[in-house]
Amino acid sequence: MRIQRSVAIAALIAASLKSVPASGGADSGVASELLKRIDELEQKVKVLERKRELEGEAAEETARKAPVVSIGSGGFTFRSADTNFVLKLRGGVQTDGRFYLGNSSANDSFLLRRVRPIVEGTLFEKYDFRIMTDFASGVTQTTVNNGTILDAYVNARFAPGFQLQFGKFKEPVGLERLQSWYNLLFVERGFPTQLAPNRDTGVMLHGELFSGTVNYAVGAFNGTLDGGSTDFDASDPDKDVAARVFSHPFKNTGTLWKGLGLGVSGTYGSHSGTPRSYASHGSQRFFAYRSGAGTNAATANILADGTNWRLSPQAYYYWGPFGLLGEYVISSQELRRDAGGAPVRAQFKNTAWQVAASYFLTGEDNSYKPVQPRRNFNPANSGWGALELTARVGELDLDDVAFPLFANPATSATGAFSWGVGANWHLNRSVKATLNFEHTDFKGGSTGVATAQDENVILGRVQVFF
């Protein structure tokens, strides 16, 4: 403003001088000198104005290149101005309560089910990475699995239909297993998840085809027993192949079948080691293979030793506030019984299935992915979050070949059938409270600690995730 005013005054003076006739040589010289100074002043003003323009342009360029920092329900995000580099700090905590009804021998308890800090981001636009750890008390740690490190991988997005992921991550098998841990319908996943592999180390090719209507994944992994996770495989040179194809045939239509998803997955490989036991939704073990020194019949020891394959047809359907999810898993494993003398071998086929339904009373659109409440919880503004009702039924059946040589029929059940109901209160996208009732009937195992009676348990959870 001051520069513009100086220019205006100088222009007026110059105009006045030019309009006054010269009265003499001296006066003419003075006028010429004054006009010269005014011209110099105008030049200086122009230089200053250009300098200000350049400074403004530089400031705009600096602002354009400056990284962007944001905080919200998606976590703490640091992003370069061109979005080619992104760093996100996220995490979640789940605090659970387990309360057993009737004459159960299990103890009621509170526990930290999951405590998971997450670091993820993008490098050079196409290379995504993720590191997730877990410090909860329920983390399983073995000689081949650092239970603290759950995810540690890089995903190269060369094209939507051609992506290469390597590191430690979930094998592409179980439908509910692949669902995010902070987006579960029930406190604990269903029986099929216990037969599907969890996280494994390997490399996987995956992507979306045909306008996003088909997702595929195929990979090579170390291989893990049912429900297990591994970092490395020191004793088994064989690797597993895992594959999955999942289709949304009506995704790009406006029909009521738009939310239908159908798929099949499976694994094939060879495993060795101690086979896993199986537990109820209340985390009571109801089946275990015999375990001993392996020197005689009384101390028989069972080991996985040979071919393993899995097959899992799966589907879900969402329409408005309604959701339905179902899956079936067959897991076949060759086992060896050591009890002195020649080992006894057998191929086992264990199966599990579940069907789970959900409905949002508050009208939100249901989804396999996390749902955003229409109105976050805020009583002052008549906001009460989203209320979701859930129900499921499922079964796990153990191969009859296991009894009595490979498992004790008195203490281990031959199968378990369960049903449950529950409610999820989504206060907002980051906070959720869950309450479940689960009933489980056990077949066999009449003298087992967990299987001598049916299990009735109330499970509760408060979750914070960002």
Task: Please place each PLM-identified region on the residue numbering.
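Bacterial N-terminal signal peptides that target proteins for export
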Residues: 1-8
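A general secondary-structure boundary signal
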Residues: 38-53, 92-94, 118-120, 151-158, ...
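Outer-membrane beta-barrel pore domains
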Residues: 103-104, 142, 153-155, 256-258, ...
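Residue-level marker for the onset of beta-strands and adjacent loop->beta junctions
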Residues: 65, 74, 150, 201, ...
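N-terminal periplasmic/intermembrane-space "pro-region" immediately following the signal or transit peptide
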Residues: 17-94, 361, 365-376, 406-408, ...
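Outer membrane beta-barrel
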Residues: 71-272, 349-382, 386-404
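Bacterial N-terminal signal peptides
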Residues: 9-18
